[in-house]
């Protein structure tokens, strides 16, 4: 087994004495830093490499702190207006994961970079911490490499805002197999529209 395989096994056993201590110390360290800052290198190099990170020019890693818990509707003094069914303010659940929120914040902060992927690095009772891999689409090392040229195209601008990253796709219900029948045809809306449109073909 290579070194990364050993690291992967360490991270799989998060309840071991070593990992519990390490994660506690790291969470304390991350709390002292700002809620979004650049990490000098990936905390989990094995995970980062599996998600597409390379230790070369054009790749950067940002660490993001996201507050845990549900979402409160941003309305003044709870005045939502409208029917009582929509009066909810406090027990609202956000449609996307906290990981996709972290990707969005990193993408907003680094507008010129492209979000490739992200992964979990720790959590405590109040926060979750994620590291987001970003790529500079104008760097020659990225543009000249056939494996990474795809992300330099304009269609991949702010892919994290449009649910095109791995974390973003999960909340959209996209996938393969019997669990993902709700999104056959590209999206929930496309599937619903196709199933609820009466087609009276001319030659039937």
From Swiss-Prot:
Gene3D superfamilies: Ribosomal protein l15e (3.40.1120.10). The keyword Ribonucleoprotein applies. InterPro entries: Rbsml_eL15_core_dom_sf, Ribosomal_eL15, Ribosomal_eL15_CS, Ribosomal_uL23/eL15/eS24_sf. Its main location: cytoplasm. It is found in: Cytoplasm. One of its GO terms (molecular function) is structural constituent of ribosome. It holds the Pfam family Ribosomal_L15e. Keywords: Cytoplasm, Ribonucleoprotein, Ribosomal protein. One of its GO terms (biological process) is cytoplasmic translation. SUPFAM superfamilies: Ribosomal proteins S24e, L23 and L15e. It comes from the Eukaryota. Component of the large ribosomal subunit. NCBIfam families: PRK04243.1. Belongs to the eukaryotic ribosomal protein eL15 family. This is Large ribosomal subunit protein eL15. It comes from Siniperca knerii.
